[in-house]
Amino acid sequence: QLSIGASAAELPDLVIIDSPDHASYAAMGIFADISDKVSDWDGIDQYYEGPLNSCKLDDKLYGLPFGSNCLALFYNEDMLADAGCEAPTTWDELKDVAQKTTQGNVTGFAMCCLQNEEGTFNFTPWLWSTGATSYDINNDNGIKALTLVKDLVDAGSMSKEVINWTQGDVMNQFISGNIAMMVNGPWQVPTMREQAPDLNWDVTLLPKDAEYASCLGGENFGVIDGDNVDAALDFLQFATSKDEVASYIDDFGYIAARKDVAEGQFTDDETMQKFTEEMQYAQPRGPHAQWPEISDALSLAVNESITGTSTPADAAAKAQSTI
């Protein structure tokens, strides 16, 4: 709709946009550069780095974060205890725990590996944990991340069906007792509590290779480059103030992109607090004007590594040629 509106010169003054798409539309000239206009706003220094960077292109700011989420590791406490395991903190521990909890009809681990943006969302934390970037995958670190996913499938610790599973499908497998650990986000927590009230589970940081990493999800405010930029900014300054964000952010199921608000969220909810902790390691997808093409290349590399269409090394080289 935003593209159609731009073509017809019929755009609103302010939009809410999925964070990985922000840079693409900024590159089209749809959004105004507000860098200088908001630099002295109260609380502008309170934003987490990841969410704020998702509003940027070439170091220029084209909006502000609305609300954020990220990915973490969910685990079935009973299954891990029965296998004599604790929640993994490293890749080696992840592979070990996944193998030990793979028994009968239960596989140890699952994550969405669809060949689309959802799959990329779930793969990038493993890529970034090695120190690699989304733009440079044809190296030892990029191949290592693809190999991790392939090894989990080859060991039987993760079903090959993950190439067909959405994040919702993964959650359903988890609450049905078919998997011991999964990658997922905070938006699943209310559903899990409602549909599986007797299931014993917890959340922890995604296991790391060289460093902790997670992928940022959420939405941003984008200011349209039109006649009403100043009016849009007046509203944005109000809507993104500390007190206003605190008044509505929980209703949207988001973690606040402002640290001074996020730190006061979920004070009685240890599970959601884990996601707030994970936010400090969450990175945006991009920001890059050609992110959709980059994302397609990354998710294809994961798919080909899992299915055996390509080796991780060949899949990385193919992805790099597109990127």
Where are these regions (language model features)?
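Long, aromatic- and glycine/proline-rich binding clefts that accommodate carbohydrate-like moieties
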Residues: P197, W201, I249-A297, E304
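Extracytoplasmic "Venus flytrap"/periplasmic binding protein-like
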Residues: Q1-Y47, D78-T89, A180-M181, T191, ...
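Extracytoplasmic/periplasmic substrate-recognition and gating elements
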Residues: D82-A83, T147, D154-S157, Q188, ...
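Glycine-centered hinge/linker elements that transmit conformational signals in sensory
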Residues: V97-T102, Y135-I163
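A structural signal for short loop-to-beta-strand junctions that line the ligand-binding cleft
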Residues: I4-G5, P12-D13, W41-M79, T107-G108, ...
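Conserved C-terminal helix/tail region of periplasmic/extracytoplasmic solute-binding proteins
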Residues: A81, D154, E277-I323
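Periplasmic solute-binding protein
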Residues: P20-I30, G50-A87, C112-S134, C215-G222, ...
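Hinge/lid segment of periplasmic solute-binding proteins
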Residues: D18-C70, K95, T101, G119-N122, ...
